[in-house]
Amino acid sequence: MPANAKVTIRYGKYEACGTVEYREDRLDGLQAVLKADGHEVELKQIEDWNVVELIVNGETVYTCNITELDFGGDGKLDPLCAEALQAVQTAY
């Protein structure tokens, strides 16, 4: 995969503090890791709850539960961010 691939992060809303909303705080680390590797990142909201999907070249290359991602941060210590980056790097 070229270093400057376009990665679409599709994410759903999740419950926190008794409310269900779209929140991007748990995506900060994932975005940071992908951008540091030279990828262009686009965020898209979807109707599904508790889900994150990474799309490269129209293919879903990685999916996880959004609540399992670390809140905030740079993503370097989050094992799910490392898995997602590996999936993007091996996509074709």
Swiss-Prot record:
Belongs to the UPF0728 family. It comes from Branchiostoma floridae (Florida lancelet). InterPro entries: UPF0728 (IPR027885). Transmembrane segments: none annotated. This is UPF0728 protein. It comes from the Eukaryota. Pfam families: UPF0728.
